[in-house]
Curated annotation (Swiss-Prot):
This is Glutamate-1-semialdehyde 2,1-aminomutase. Its EC number is 5.4.3.8. It comes from the Bacteria. The lineage of its organism: Bacteria, Pseudomonadati, Bdellovibrionota, Bdellovibrionia, Bdellovibrionales. It is found in: Cytoplasm. PROSITE patterns: AA_TRANSFER_CLASS_3. It comes from Bdellovibrio bacteriovorus (strain ATCC 15356 / DSM 50701 / NCIMB 9529 / HD100). Pathway: Porphyrin-containing compound metabolism; protoporphyrin-IX biosynthesis; 5-aminolevulinate from L-glutamyl-tRNA(Glu): step 2/2. CDD domains: OAT_like.
Length: 426
């Protein structure tokens, strides 16, 4: 009996979906092979349609901090499936998660659940514009905030005076409302504010940029961002879709000591289900309908299965001291890879923050902006990725995506994976 292969499935998928996928990074574009098609996931492993097991460091790009099919989350989800799938009405499950978040994180005075990080960002920007009466949004080059039209832009020539869309189908007049500034450059940021500060409704930033490599920001730079926002009457929005509940219970708000006006969440907050959230200061969130005139709605917002999965995940992480456990495990893992690269004499390095890591080319100084990323990043990664994949390690299939470690990754498994990654390096 013929067993279907990933290549065969990809050819079928190409006939029914753009590029054969439902999110671009899954396509293995630039890797000169078809993507692996998976049929099962459990713990730290993915199993392909060819019945090959892979140690998974993608973890669905971040949501699965406990690993795939965590027993406690699975039990709660099964219970919820037998109770209700969706209400489209008020229910107790979103209330319980909202109360847990607002009582745990003092900067989240009020919040609204949505179905994705993109929706959370889109809604937060709308609140900011309504609150300030201004139209422009300042974002940073190298920070990703979902596929919101006016944030899918990159800097034009010169000092962020204009912005050009990074996607077809976005009118120039939409992109014109976005100002793009470089990361890690207080002087240029001050210049942008001096020129356009009175028009900037909000600054949105990943306080730990992790969608274009792992671009760890200096505390001084983040403080300058907050200072200029306050001075110019612009709101500060932290996009913690990746870093929220990943780097610690309080995310980068807690790590930096900076209190933004609004924060956006996704990924971990839904425990593996499609959930996003935006919230912050009560006076701002009270502007959202039906309390105020900022309209935002969603048929499946606060779906009960996602609410229970998210709450179960967060409570377990808190109970087992999950963030400290993960940070220690990940550091041991990345230290082993780092030592292996040095011993082998390969021109690769690895950066790590909490349970996030990123493999990149050598640099003379920390990579804090996209300008610091080595020019040969793509080529270095391609060979490493394909060799590691062949040996059973699944990294995110893009040179600029970070890796994620979950509680399902034991020390022994991480030691095994580290050796595979080192062996794959050249």
């Amino acid at each position: 009996m013929h067993k279907v292969t990933s290549e065969e499935l990809f050819q079928r998928a190409l006939k029914v979906a753009p590029g054969g996928v439902h999110s671009p990074v899954r396509s293995f574009k630039g890797l000169d092979r078809a993507p692996v098609f998976f049929k099962k996931a459990e713990g730290a492993y993915l199993t392909s349609v060819e019945d090959k097991k892979y140690i998974d460091f993608c973890q669905s790009f971040g949501p699965l901090i406990l690993g795939h099919l965590d027993a406690e989350v699975k039990e709660e989800v099964h219970r919820m499936v037998d109770t209700a799938w969706t209400f489209g009405a008020t229910e107790i499950y979103s209330l319980e998660l909202a109360e847990w978040i607002t009582s745990t994180l003092p900067f989240m005075e009020k919040l609204r659940f949505v179905s994705s990080g993109t929706e959370a960002v889109m809604s937060a920007l709308r609140v900011a514009r309504a609150a300030t009466g201004r139209t422009k949004i300042l974002k940073f080059e190298g920070c990703y905030h979902g596929h919101v039209d006016n944030l899918l832009v990159k800097a034009g020539s010169g000092l962020a005076g204009t912005a050009a869309s990074s996607s077809a189908g976005i009118p120039a007049e939409v992109a014109a409302h976005t100002v793009v500034a470089p990361l890690d450059d207080e002087a240029k940021l001050a210049e942008v504010f001096a020129a356009q500060g009175k028009d900037i409704a909000a600054v949105i930033i990943e306080p730990l940029p992790a969608n274009y490599g792992l671009l760890v920001q200096r505390p001084e730079f983040l403080k300058k961002v907050a200072e200029l926002c306050e001075k110019n009457g612009s709101l500060l929005i932290f996009d913690e879709v990746i870093s929220g509940f990943r780097v610690g219970l309080g995310g980068m708000v807690e790590k930096t000591g900076i209190r933004p006006d609004l924060v956006t969440y996704g990924k971990i907050i839904g425990g593996g289900f499609p959930v996003g959230c935006y919230g912050g200061k009560a006076e701002l969130m009270n502007m959202v309908a039906p309390s105020g005139d900022v309209y935002q709605a969603g048929t499946l917002s606060a779906n009960p299965i996602g609410m229970r999965a998210g709450l179960t995940t967060l409570k377990k992480m808190q109970r087992v001291d999950g963030w400290n456990v993960l940070e220690q495990r990940t550091k041991k893992f990345t230290d082993a890879i780092k030592a292996g690269f040095v011993k082998k004499g390969v021109n690769l390095e690895i950066s790590q923050v909490a349970s996030l890591f990123w493999i990149h080319g050598p640099t003379a100084s920390p990579i804090r902006s996209i300008d610091h990323i080595p020019a040969n990043q793509g080529g270095n990664f391609k060979n490493l990725f394909l060799k590691a994949l062949d040996k059973g390690v699944y990294l995110a299939p893009n040179a600029y995506e970070v890796g994620f470690v979950s509680l399902a990754h034991s020390d022994e498994l991480l030691e095994q994976a580290a050796q595979i990654i080192v062996d794959a390096a050249e």
